[in-house]
Design a protein with these regions (language model features):
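Surface-exposed loop/turn motifs in large extracellular/passenger domains
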Residues: 1-201
Length: 201
């Protein structure tokens, strides 16, 4: 489910943008699908993914990202799988995290679930496009497990020079991080959370 491309496998994705609203509901047993502002699922195999911009509000039940809900790369060591991508849309889980399925898991400003991937010079300021401001009555938006400003969950993935910018929001309930919700056999290089960025749990 996506604003521009539902599934892309081994094709270059360059200079695309999305706006408006993207909402989706997926089966909860398969990680290799997602809901994204640009793409639901991206697999690069060395193809270029760069200069993508999302301003759409994206909401889904799992693997939700401003650029891609699910992203699988090839070039982990170099930072070239995904580069120079930006999100300014509000990214939310539509459901609370479930202990017996993947519902409510993997929500990220750029990528919800990253597998064997490298991201470089990606930036997120979630909610800025619509002028969103968090209020106490918005506590029902605090849903999701593994929620990150850039990546919700990274498996064997690396981030280089990525930033969560000021005046953006990362809204979740468990394992919420300004840059990454959680990493498994992964790494960050010079990740930056701006001083005025807001993480709410």
């Amino acid at each position: 489910v996506a604003g521009v491309i539902e599934v892309s496998d081994s094709k270059s994705v360059i200079k695309l943008s999305a706006s408006g609203t993207v909402t989706g509901t997926l089966p909860t047993g398969d990680t290799a699908r997602g809901i994204g502002g640009i793409a639901g699922s991206l697999t690069t195999n060395g193809a270029a993914v760069k200069t993508l911009t999302n301003s759409a509000a994206v909401t889904g039940n799992r693997s939700v990202g401003g650029i891609a809900g699910y992203f699988s790369g090839k070039d982990q060591a170099t930072g070239k799988d995904m580069s120079d991508c930006k999100n300014e849309g509000l990214i939310l889980s539509s459901t609370a995290a479930d202990d017996h399925s993947l519902a409510g898991h993997y929500i990220g400003g750029i990528v919800g679930y990253a597998h064997n991937a490298s991201l470089s010079e990606c930036r997120s300021r979630a909610g800025y496009a619509d002028g969103y401001t968090y209020k106490q009555e918005d506590r029902d938006k605090l849903r999701g497990r593994y929620v990150g400003g850039i990546v919700g969950y990274g498996e064997q993935s690396v981030l280089y020079d990525c930033e969560t910018e000021a005046n953006g929001y990362v809204l979740g309930s468990e394992y919420v991080g300004g840059i990454i919700g959680a990493l498994n056999q992964s790494d960050t290089q010079t990740a930056l959370l701006s001083e005025n960025g807001t993480r709410t749990t």
